[in-house]
Amino acid sequence: RGDFYSGQHVCLSCKAKQQAAQLAAKTEARRLAKETTKVMRAQAKKQAYDRKYDAEKRAQVSAQDAELARRTLAKRRLIEFTRRFHPDYQAGWVHRDVCRRLEQFLQDVVDKKSPRLMLFLPPRSGKSALVSVNFPAWILGQHPEMEIISSSYAVSLPITFSRKVRELVQDPAYQSIFPATHLDRSSASAEAWLTTQGGGYVASGVGTGITGKGFNIGIIDDPIKDAEEADSETVREKVWDWYSSTFYTRAAPGAGILVVLTRWHDADLAGKLLQRMKEDKAEGVSNLDDWQVISYPAIAVTDEWVNVDGTITEEPKTPQAIKVRNKGEALHPERFPVERLERIKQT
């Protein structure tokens, strides 16, 4: 049959087949396009899932790495250990400085150097939480074989400290940092308890006996309650007799003694110990107790620089010294502003 307009011969059957083939091709193309889109969407969804999974995995690994880093830091640094278990602890420069000195004190005990350290701090400066609770717990984490005696003017205080240290040692978070330190269940009273490695914590009141107990580290935290008691010569002599005849005799070879107090009187325990050291040096006594004294007044009486050798002086000894406060500044203004300290001083 011819095409009327073109005059060309057209096979209708062939044209129908051609159109059918084109339609089939278009249908197949649409099907393939749908399949391709479906596959691409599935791949995109899988890629998105993989990216999310990888991101979550990286975040998890990052969180685990961060946690391990925090544990390592808490194990190495006392101030970080304190912050980990007491997130609300208000740590100022003074607390960081005290922690640094306590770390060195512990190392000197390990090295059998018989360190003697006095820290003079005002009341309510956070010293007991640091010195009588966190420091002993940190010590036992690193050296569970060490024996610690903690003393204060009333035995109820070190017993309270002892309970807190014991609770810390049993805390799962503590165990994640110091997995080798465990409480000996057969000896776990609040007044005296042991670790499975033979170390432990003994609470003692000034003036009470410490029969049969020795120490690698002896802590005396405020041996006199307040200024009123410090004015009593009888009380001061009682403290001195207890120190020289009871506490001091319990020191193991190479043991360290740490005295932390508020100075209420020139002839208090610290005053007597420093006078004894002065006399021993004058007489050329060997193996004397050589006390390192660090004083942190509530209000700075001079500019204060911490030197590389640990001393705090009015002027820097070397360019590496760090200025911690100016004359007239409060020790820890976030806790006790200078205005409040001045009011307390006036009363």
Which sequence ranges carry the predicted segments?
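Cysteine-rich micro-motifs
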Residues: 4-17
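N-terminal accessory segments
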Residues: 23-114
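Phosphate/oxyanion-binding active-site loops and adjacent basic polyanion-contact surfaces
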Residues: 90-95, 127-128, 132, 236-239
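Residue-level preference for the first positions of well-ordered beta-strands
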Residues: 116-118, 147-149, 200, 217, ...
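Conserved RecA-like ASCE ATPase "motif II neighborhood" in helicase/translocase motors
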Residues: 190-246
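Non-catalytic, compositionally simple segments
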Residues: 228-347
